[in-house]
From Swiss-Prot:
Keywords: Acyltransferase, Cytoplasm, Transferase. This is Leucyl/phenylalanyl-tRNA--protein transferase. Its main location: cytoplasm. It comes from Cupriavidus necator (strain ATCC 17699 / DSM 428 / KCTC 22496 / NCIMB 10442 / H16 / Stanier 337). One of its GO terms (cellular component) is cytoplasm. Belongs to the L/F-transferase family. The gene is aat. It is found in: Cytoplasm.
């Protein structure tokens, strides 16, 4: 059994989440409350929401937890070549928070292999939109010739980033945004990006699973640090991966 949370209820301890032999490993609690306050309380404890339309809000704390250290991003030869083009070509732009809600909607509507529908419901978009307006959620976007072709979004608390979803409408466009995010976060002393659940795709990008207890301890320490401000991106931060100077602006 899992806990049902009324709006005033705290989360149960994360070690009470369902175990690996259950039908839903990592499931901790359920509620109808998806307020920004509930979301912030969840993230600071290593908990995230994931549910389908028509279900109550389901809260998870998986063990192990998939994380990506920004310096560990695995840049393939093809992606490295793409990043060099991005740096040299003024047709390519990396924008931060150009249109956060548009990125969320693109993540919700972009078809994915093996996935029917989306967990990014209207309620999710509204709740994370509020976090964004309060400076606690951000998007990183790949633009080509004035068109948004890829991007990602997540929650930023202190020196911790919780990745939520990404999309690509052009080859490697989401990976370009991820490389930009890793470069930006690395420059600001962020040691870990939360990737939530273990998948082969995330592993191919350099993410790795760590014990939940280790993850939660890191989250508590990192979210207590000062927040990154402002969120501004310059192409030159990608030079650490691509090794090619960015073209001058103008």
């Amino acid at each position: 059994m899992i806990a049902w949370l009324d709006p005033q209820d705290p989360f149960p301890p994360v070690d009470e989440a369902l175990g690996p032999d259950s039908e839903a490993p990592g499931l901790l609690a359920a509620s109808r409350d998806l307020s920004p306050q509930r979301l912030l309380l969840a993230y600071r404890q290593g908990i995230f929401p994931w549910y389908s339309s028509g279900q109550p809000v389901l809260w998870w704390s998986t063990d192990p937890r998939m994380v990506l250290a920004p310096p560990a991003l695995r840049v393939s030869l093809n992606l490295r070549k793409t990043l060099r083009r991005v740096l040299r070509d003024a047709d390519w732009e990396i924008r931060v928070d150009d249109d956060f809600l548009a990125v969320m909607r693109a993540c919700a509507t972009t078809p994915r292999d093996g996935q029917d529908g989306t967990w990014i419901t209207d309620d999710i978009i509204a709740a994370y939109g509020t976090l964004h307006r309060n400076g606690m959620a951000h998007s990183v976007e790949s633009w080509y010739r004035g068109e948004r072709v890829g991007g990602l979004y997540g929650v930023a608390l202190g020196r911790m980033f919780f990745g939520e979803s990404m999309f690509a409408h052009r080859t490697d466009a989401s990976k370009i945004a991820l490389a930009a995010l890793c470069a930006f976060l690395g420059n600001h002393g962020v040691a870990m990006i939360d990737c939530q659940q273990e998948t082969d795709h995330l592993a191919s990008l350099g993410a790795r699973p760590i014990p939940r207890a280790e993850f939660v301890a890191h989250v508590r320490a990192a979210t207590a640090l000062p927040a990154i401000s402002p969120w501004r991106f310059d192409k030159s931060v990608l030079e650490r991966w691509a090794g090619t100077p960015a073209a001058p602006a103008g």
